[in-house]
Amino acid sequence: MFLAIEDERNPMHIGNVSVFEGPPPTYGDFVRTVAANLPLVPRYRQRVRFVPMELGRPVWVDDAHFQILYHIRRTAIPQPGSAEELRNLAGRVFAQNLDRGKPLWELWMVEGLEAGRWALISKVHHCMVDGVSGTDLLTVLLDREPKPPPTRAPDWRPAEEPSDLHLLADAAADAILDPFNRVRGLPIVRV
């Protein structure tokens, strides 16, 4: 649903700005930490695949060309690194739609905040998390439970992407079964 109502002027992503005390981790360490935690949120390596001719609901497929460095960006705001400058940057980041040809998330590591602080700007499409109960990458990264730092990301191999024919066959099966699912959800009325 959130994909269907999104357009250029109405992005459907959820944004978050988190500010941290102290110096930031190195960009390389941060990327390695995110990569090591991606197995906990497999959706973050998947992209949306649309059924040909829009005959069915979009499906999630592993992104065979996943590049973590596309999703984790690093930037700095100009001195003095005020909250207003951070808000302006976040506004520019949030104003841009996510690329639907890739997994629908971005993390921006922001350096240069006043008082030696740094920030993380997170942007995730609403179809991936609901903002309340959905597990997202930021939740995993900011877990308060002590754990050893990840050493390296486990090897990952994307699943084979379904063919157009497979997607159309699944859409046809859903169309046949869907009336039964709709009826099953109706209330029983006794006269």
What residues fall within each predicted segment?
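Soluble acyl-CoA-dependent acyltransferase catalytic core bearing the H(X)4D motif
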Residues: 6-11, 15-191
